[in-house]
């Protein structure tokens, strides 16, 4: 017997501890806690190696789960035609189509959702932070700090906006790049109207840009459409509607948008 199998030899000769199963169960139950503890407390190279190991484990686990799911799915047609004749009472039954029906239902639902929330510009170019912000140095000559940023793109601020004190203002939005109105085109009516902007709903670049009210190509803004006289099915006047910016406001000097209907 090879020298490295002494543990197996001992087990064959003397058997296991009487509480072996209980100890194994408890050890397996503690593994989750130990993994969590290591993930939080390890630092440096050991942490990197540990995270790499965990990543590979998770990838393998996901592959295994996917394989199990594919194995359990009932296919729409049998892999090979059956050679045995079916009895009379089974002839009217179709082959199992659970997976096919479920798949088509999910696809239809996704298509409806996509149509409901479709926008004129589904993809936009990413904007780097260097392009979005200009570093502003502040402080005395001997100790200049570079923690302030000036936004180089057009922005929207509400009517009740007040600047923070200069010492605490991290992001500067220049007055010359603040916009209050947008040229909104109604796609069905084919008219373009200048409407006041109410708020910035979503900037596709970054959630922080949404908070700052940055207006870039592809941004979703809410505009006041009360001038258009749109009404709901119940007869109420529509006040605010969403629109997507279709031009580059920093180049054109104006905000052009298409109403989402």
Swiss-Prot record:
Biased composition (Basic residues): 51-65
Any coiled-coil regions, as ranges: none
One annotated Gene Ontology cellular component of this protein: preribosome, large subunit precursor
Entry keyword set: Nucleus, Ribonucleoprotein, Ribosome biogenesis, rRNA processing
GO biological-process terms attached to the record: maturation of 5.8S rRNA from tricistronic rRNA transcript (SSU-rRNA, 5.8S rRNA, LSU-rRNA); maturation of LSU-rRNA from tricistronic rRNA transcript (SSU-rRNA, 5.8S rRNA, LSU-rRNA)
InterPro entries, sorted: NSA2_fam, Ribosomal_Se8/biogenesis_NSA2
Keyword rRNA processing: yes
Protein name: Ribosome biogenesis protein nsa2
Taxonomic placement: Eukaryota, Fungi, Dikarya, Ascomycota, Pezizomycotina
């Amino acid at each position: 017997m090879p020298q490295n199998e002494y543990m197996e030899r001992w087990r064959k000769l003397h058997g296991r501890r009487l509480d072996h199963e209980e100890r194994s169960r408890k050890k397996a139950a503690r593994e989750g806690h130990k993994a969590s503890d290591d993930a939080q407390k390890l630092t440096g190279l050991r942490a990197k190696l540990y995270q790499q190991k965990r990543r590979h484990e998770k990838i393998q686990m996901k592959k295994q789960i996917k394989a199990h799911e594919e194995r359990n799915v009932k296919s729409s047609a049998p892999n090979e035609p059956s050679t045995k004749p079916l009895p009379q009472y089974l002839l009217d039954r179709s082959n199992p189509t659970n997976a096919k029906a479920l798949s088509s239902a999910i696809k239809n639902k996704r298509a409806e959702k996509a149509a409901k929330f479709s926008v004129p510009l589904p993809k936009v170019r990413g904007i780097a932070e260097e392009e979005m912000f200009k570093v502003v140095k502040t402080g005395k000559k001997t100790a200049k700090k570079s923690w302030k940023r000036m936004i180089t793109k057009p922005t929207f601020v509400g009517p009740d906006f007040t600047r923070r004190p200069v010492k605490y203002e991290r992001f500067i939005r220049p007055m010359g790049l603040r916009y209050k109105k947008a040229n909104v085109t109604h796609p069905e009516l084919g008219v373009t109207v200048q409407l006041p902007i109410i708020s910035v709903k979503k900037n596709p670049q970054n959630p922080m840009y949404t908070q700052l009210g940055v207006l870039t190509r592809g941004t979703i803004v809410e505009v006041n459409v009360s001038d258009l006289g749109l009404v709901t099915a119940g007869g109420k006047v529509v006040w605010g509607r969403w629109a997507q910016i279709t031009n580059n406001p920093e180049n054109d000097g104006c905000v052009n948008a298409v109403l989402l209907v």
